[in-house]
C-alpha cells in the first residue's frame, strides 16, 4: 500500500554510520565442520542514522541485524550427491529513522519488525548432467531475482527489492526480511548463460494486514 506523505519539508539531511561486523568460520568446531561439508556462519551489521533536518521530525535511530545458520553438503555425511541444505535465522532489533524521515522506501536496507525468526531455509538438488538445480523451502525472491550484486554497497533500500513489485504485492512479497515457501529451478549450461524460474507464496505473512506476530 502506498502511503501519502504530506507536510514534509523538502530538504532532508541524514547522517549515517554503518558498522558491519562479520564472524565466520572461526574456531575448531567450524574447521571440523568444513571438513565434513558443513559451514557455520554468523554475521552482524549495525548502523546509526540521524535525521538532522527536514522530514517529519528530527532524531536518531539504531538498527541491528544478526544473521546466523549453517550450510551443508549432504553428499559427504549422507551420500546424497549434489544435495545441499541451508538453515538460517535472523535477529532484527533497534528502531530506525524511517518514521522520522517519512520515507516510502526504507532509508535503511536492514530495518524491519524487531524479531528473532527463521530465515532462508531450503534444500537444493543439482543435476550436473542437465546443468539444472532445484531449490525448495523458505526462499527470498530478492536473493536471485530482480537484484544486483553491486546494490549491496548501498544503504538505501531502493537499491534492493524493486518498488514496482513491493508496492503491488501483498505485504511486499517474498523479500527481506520475510521469506516465503517456494521453489526455484535454475538452468546454467555455462558461466555466461543461465535461465531460472521461481514460484513463491504471494503473501509471506499469510495475513492481509501484515501482522508481524503471524510469522
Positions of predicted regions on the chain:
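Bacterial N-terminal signal peptides that target proteins for export
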Residues: 2-13
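Outer-membrane beta-barrel biogenesis signature
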Residues: 23-39, 140-154
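Short loop/turn motifs that connect adjacent beta-strands in outer-membrane beta-barrel proteins
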Residues: 25-39, 73-85, 128-131, 192
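Transmembrane beta-strand segments of Gram-negative outer membrane beta-barrel proteins
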Residues: 30-52, 83-87, 95, 157, ...
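Residues that define the transmembrane beta-barrel architecture of outer-membrane proteins
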Residues: 36, 48-50, 60-66, 115-119, ...
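Transmembrane beta-barrel strands of outer-membrane/channel proteins
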Residues: 40-48, 85-91, 134-140, 195-201
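Residues on the lipid-exposed face of transmembrane beta-strands in outer-membrane beta-barrel proteins
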Residues: 42, 68-74, 120-125, 136, ...
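Surface-exposed coil loops of outer-membrane beta-barrel proteins
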Residues: 97-120, 130-215
Amino acid at each position: 500500500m502506498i502511503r501519502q506523505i504530506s507536510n514534509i519539508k523538502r530538504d532532508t539531511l541524514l547522517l549515517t554510520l554503518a558498522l558491519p561486523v562479520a564472524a565466520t568460520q572461526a574456531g575448531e568446531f567450524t574447521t571440523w565442520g568444513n571438513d565434513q561439508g558443513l559451514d557455520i556462519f554468523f554475521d552482524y551489521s549495525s548502523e546509526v542514522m540521524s535525521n538532522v533536518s527536514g522530514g517529519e521530525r528530527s532524531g536518531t535511530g539504531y538498527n541491528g541485524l544478526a544473521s546466523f545458520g549453517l550450510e551443508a553438503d549432504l553428499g559427504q555425511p549422507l551420500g546424497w550427491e549434489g544435495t545441499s541444505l541451508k538453515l538460517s535465522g535472523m535477529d532484527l532489533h533497534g528502531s530506525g529513522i524511517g518514521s522520522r524521515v517519512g520515507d516510502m522506501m526504507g532509508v535503511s536496507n536492514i530495518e524491519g519488525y524487531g524479531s528473532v525468526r527463521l530465515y532462508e531455509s531450503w534444500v537444493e538438488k543439482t543435476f550436473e548432467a542437465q546443468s539444472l538445480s532445484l531449490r525448495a523451502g523458505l526462499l527470498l525472491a530478492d536473493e536471485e531475482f530482480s537484484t544486483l550484486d553491486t546494490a549491496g554497497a548501498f544503504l538505501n533500500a531502493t537499491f534492493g527489492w524493486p518498488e514496482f513489485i513491493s508496492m503491488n504485492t501483498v505485504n511486499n512479497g517474498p523479500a527481506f526480511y520475510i521469506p516465503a515457501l517456494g521453489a526455484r529451478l535454475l538452468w546454467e549450461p555455462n558461466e555466461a548463460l543461465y535461465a531460472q524460474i521461481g514460484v513463491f507464496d504471494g503473501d509471506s505473512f499469510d495475513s492481509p494486514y501484515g501482522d508481524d506476530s503471524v510469522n
